[in-house]
Amino acid sequence: MEDVLEVYKLPYDAHRPLICMDEMPKQLLADKQEPLPCQAGTPAREDYEYKRNGVADLFMVFEPLAGKRFVEVTEKRRKIEWATVMKQVSDVFYPQAEKILVVLDNLNTHSPSAFYETFEPEEARRLVERFEFHFTPKHGSWLNMAEIELSALVRQCLDRRIPDIQTLTQEVQAWQEQRNDEVVKVLWQFTTTDARTKLKHLYPKFSGVTDY
């Protein structure tokens, strides 16, 4: 936990950008009957029946100090999707960076080994060296600022039925562009000092050192 909190204290550095990465599934649901539009005194209505069209995955890449975010929509959630998104982060979003600091959850797909399972060894090694990973602790996903952005995405864009991955991609891209135009940042205020005080119960108990 303290590792992530110390990283959040770092000042903005374009050569060493700090990004937060998280992902979430989105179930694709299509209406079986056309929804009824709203009229004077009557809200819009949709039938309770719907058709399941599978599940898509959304990867959120958020740079809190710059107010930029990039959302990638994929059909599956595997190591290959994560590695491919991270390659895009390296070579498309931050090609000039010397090192990219990444805060992310400790999922089984979020591993440097994913690069070797997706790319040739030389390319995998190049990508591993592009990143400096800082993992949130178990049950500590709230430390990941990308989770805040995903919550905003759900509230503002995904709180309704979306029938297919094409529509989902279009809706997410429109949300991303608007939010980036507004340069929405996150000012993180929870510090290591706060953690040692307010979350003291999560720390191992100090038993002292005995001199011999």
What are the residue ranges of the model-derived segments?
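Acidic/histidine-rich, metal-coordinating catalytic segments
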Residues: 97-111
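RNase H-like polynucleotidyl transferase catalytic core
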Residues: 44-51, 123-145, 160-164
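Mobile genetic element proteins and their domesticated derivatives, centered on retroelements
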Residues: 20-22, 61, 67, 86, ...
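Active-site proximal helix-loop segment of RNase H-like, two-metal nucleases, encompassing DDE(D)
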Residues: 69, 138, 146-165, 178-183
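Short, basic/hydrophobic alpha-helical segments
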Residues: 80-101
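C-terminal domain-tail junction helix/linker
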Residues: 32, 167-212
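Extended, low-complexity cationic-aromatic segments
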Residues: 1-87, 199
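Intrinsically disordered, low-complexity and often Lys/Arg-enriched segments
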Residues: 91-92, 98, 121, 204-212
